[in-house]
Amino acid sequence: NNSSSKNGADFIIEHADIRRTLLNMKSIIEGERALCFWLSQQTEVSLNHPDEKTRQEASDYVSLMTPVVKSLFTDLAMEITSDAMQIHGGYGYTKDQGIEQLYRDNRITPIYEGTNSVQASDLVFRKLSNKNGNIINKFLDQVKSECKTDNEKIKPFLSEFNKNLDTLKKFSDWMTDKAKTEKDDVSAGANDYLKTLGYVSIAYAWIKVLEVSFKDYEENKNFYNDKIDTARFYFDKVLPRAEHHYKSAISGSSNIMNFKFN
């Protein structure tokens, strides 16, 4: 309900920043779920498909994306839980509200399995270089080939998506090249790379959601309108983070490694 309260004060839902925060939470969570469904499908293919080559390809994708799901998703869980607390103001910090318990419960998740930095290192030093970089390149090629359409309604989303996909390709090539001579650059940029891969992969999952949403739109307009509007927020407000992480990483590691700690 977006109407004002009876005493003349605005409900918090009428404030643009509250709405932004809620949509940030919603667009990330729903995109993560869609990507997890895709990853679960790849797991099934890797185990049960009759063709050996197809099984191996799916297994490679699961291996590539596992650090992303473990690391980025738990980092975002902390961001989202913190935002949920923030929306409630001081009351969100109290025990009887419940969000502070969720925050404390979630805080361990980025530390599980060797911490998220270890997941990022595993991605860039092992998964990215595996099979001479063929896995990431094959993944990018498959995504690009799948994300083509004559649907005019999806094309604006694809335009933004393809720009970020190109950024991910440049980032992957940069990391692969630096791994040969400048391992500090790779290590310093590992978290940034993982996040870029993650945000672009979530966008890929949203493209798949949009394809269904526009195809089946007449069957449930309210439901699919919600999906389309949520995807639009993700592409406008969240996906640009991918470019930011790329620019941060390619600045290198010299400042980091030369800094004198007391």
For each predicted feature, which ranges?
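Aromatic- and histidine-enriched alpha-helix N-cap/loop-to-helix transition segments
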Residues: 27-34, 72-75, 194-201
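Glycine-rich cofactor-pocket loops
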Residues: 1-25, 41-62, 147-159, 175-191, ...
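C-terminal amphipathic alpha-helical interaction region
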Residues: 130, 146-262
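Alpha-helix capping/hinge segments and adjacent helical runs
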Residues: 38, 60-138, 233-256, 261
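Short glycine/serine- and small hydrophobic-enriched flexible loop segments
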Residues: 41, 82, 125-126, 205-211
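Short amphipathic alpha-helical segments with heptad-repeat character
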Residues: 23-26, 67, 74, 162
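Amphipathic, well-packed alpha-helical segments that form the structural scaffold of globular domains
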Residues: 37-40, 44, 78-85, 144, ...
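Acidic/histidine-rich catalytic neighborhood
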Residues: 4-53, 94-113, 117-118, 123-130
